Every structure is written in C-alpha cells, then in structure tokens.
Amino acid sequence: MRSLWIAVAMYSKLPVPQVEWDRKSLSWALCFFPVVGVVIGLLLGLWLELCALLDIGPWLRAAGALLLPVAVSGAIHLDGFCDTADALGSHQPREKKLEILKDSHTGAFAIICCCLYLITFFAVWCEAEPAGGAFWVLCLGPALSRSLSGLAACSWPNARGSGLLATFTQPMDAKRARVVLVLWVIGCCAGMLWLDLWAGAFTVAGALLSFLYYRVMSTRQFGGVTGDLGGFFLQICECAMVLQVVLAQRIEVLL
C-alpha cells in the first residue's frame, strides 16, 4: 500500500497517509500512477453526470472538465508541458534543452503554448457530447494517458539519468513494471472498445498516435524521457483523446 500512497501523493493533491519513501516502496510506485487517472476519471464522470442532470451548458461543462484534472494533479503535468514548450521553442542543442527543462523560470514559449493548449482543449470539450458509451470512454482517458506515460518512463532511456523520474525508475524491476503497465494499457483500451466500439477505437488510435509522437520527439530532441516530457505527453494525449471522441461522434452522424 505504501507504493500506492507514494504515487498518489506525488502525482496528485489528494489527501493520503504519509509514508516513508524507501527503495522497496519506490520500486512499485510508478505502477500505481494510473490509479490517479482512475480517480480523475470518476470525478470527471460525476461532473458530467451533474451537468446532464442540471442541464448545464457546454461552456461551463467544458470548463469543469478542463480544470478538474489540473486541480486534482496540482498542475504538475501542465508544468511539465510548459517547461517542454520552452525547451522545444528554444531550438537549442540537446544539452541546452535539458538545462531549460530544469530552469524554474517561465519563458515566452511556455506562456504562449499553455494559452493555446488550454483554449484548444476547452474548445474540444465544448464540442464533445458526453452521451452513451462515449461518456465513459472519456472518463477512461486519464487512466490510459497515465498508463502510457508510466510505460514510457520504465521502457525508454532517461535523458538525464537523474532527476525526479529517476527516483522512481532506478529502484524498480523494469520488466515487472512494464508487465503491470502494459496490463493497465490493455485494460483501458479494452474498456474503451467495450463501452463504445466506434468512439473507443478513435480514442485508442489518438492515444497511440500521441504515444508514437512522444517516442519520436523525446528521442530526437532530448535523447530520452524526463518527468517534464512525461507531463507534456500526458497533456497532449488527453487533448487528443477528447478530440478523437468528437471526430468519432461527428463522423458517426454523417454515416
């Protein structure tokens, strides 16, 4: 249970018991990262149900759906998105990009990209129709994005070989962790397809394409992954999944 509490304490603002961060507990902590996504998905489902019950309009519904994950996670992943945007926007050599990721200052690229991202994600949520199976497909998105992020962390090289991400990956049994996280990914994908085959297929495709982009970008630009890059991927993946649900719903109407 200590690994679970460490994962929840690290990747969310949810109140959990304080435990010692020993090597044994850290070795399994990343495997519980998707649990935070499950909690966010449940809260998201409650919010969307409340919006439907009270006939709340798309703007307020979208604002809540956008802000809820940020509030629960403490914006830790959005911070990584901003740091990565600064690094990519600098067009500097790899070593300099890694230094920018560690810089606590916020640059112009981070502010611009963050604003554009939030506007885009808000607009996408406004277009989503949380009805039928697609409703619950949307709620599985946060768990799938975190499963893929964790899988990348324990499968791909660490760009720095140190840092917060290394705190979790160095003590772990990488093979066992990969098995657990692959099972998380399979479970989330299977759940999406079972809930709504059409919307689920689009959503899974969006998540996997985001994962492929993450692999190519992180390798070419940084030589591996970091915690900030993981946050960048997670934000991109979640926006892509909601966008895919919107596309699935629109195409289904045309057919």
Predicted regions and their residues:
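Hydrophobic alpha-helical transmembrane segments
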Residues: 1-74, 92, 96-98, 103-255
